[in-house]
């Protein structure tokens, strides 16, 4: 392999890499604790909003880009299929807007990528639905426009953000901002944990688990 851009290291520098493991995982754990302590009430409120939507025959729409798109798909699968095998419940309707490549590419080609999620919210969104918008920076134009469309249509909105919240700060009915800037990874780790807690709480609120 070419080494012009490689740092000094080595495959067998175990002590150095042990430090990396500890630094990354312990920082992530501290960040999780901060998010939990600062946002427990809003997380409960988000879960209640979602549970009330399901109780009123609504559904959840989710959108994000890159790793946030993967998180959106992850959560949609846990709602529609199953979160834990020990809990028997009906399917809960959730759609990740990043999964239909034909719609995404048609929208990007015909309307511009910034408008693709908004167009899908316009197509699928109804009054009792909830949009969960994920952006590690809070500055994703496509996610911001989806949030704007959801509000115009009367959907309830949740934003999971990072850093200082970016342009999306203050736009959603409920928001959670992970206080980490400079990289998306630590923010995404907190987002997916929050989403798991949301699914857990929604199942409890709907009476599917104690």
Curated annotation (Swiss-Prot):
Annotated Gene Ontology cellular component terms: cytoplasm
Source species of the chain: Chlorobium chlorochromatii (strain CaD3)
SUPFAM superfamilies referenced in this protein's UniProt entry, alphabetically: SIS domain
Cofactor(s), by name: Zn(2+)
HAMAP family xref list: GmhA
Entry's Gene Ontology molecular function annotations: carbohydrate derivative binding; D-sedoheptulose 7-phosphate isomerase activity; zinc ion binding
Family: Belongs to the SIS family. GmhA subfamily.
Listed GO biological process terms: carbohydrate metabolic process; D-glycero-D-manno-heptose 7-phosphate biosynthetic process
The protein's name: Phosphoheptose isomerase
Catalysed reactions, semicolon-separated: 2 D-sedoheptulose 7-phosphate = D-glycero-alpha-D-manno-heptose 7-phosphate + D-glycero-beta-D-manno-heptose 7-phosphate
Keywords: Carbohydrate metabolism, Cytoplasm, Isomerase, Metal-binding, Zinc
Additional record remark: The reaction produces a racemic mixture of D-glycero-alpha-D-manno-heptose 7-phosphate and D-glycero-beta-D-manno-heptose 7-phosphate.
Cofactor note: Binds 1 zinc ion per subunit.
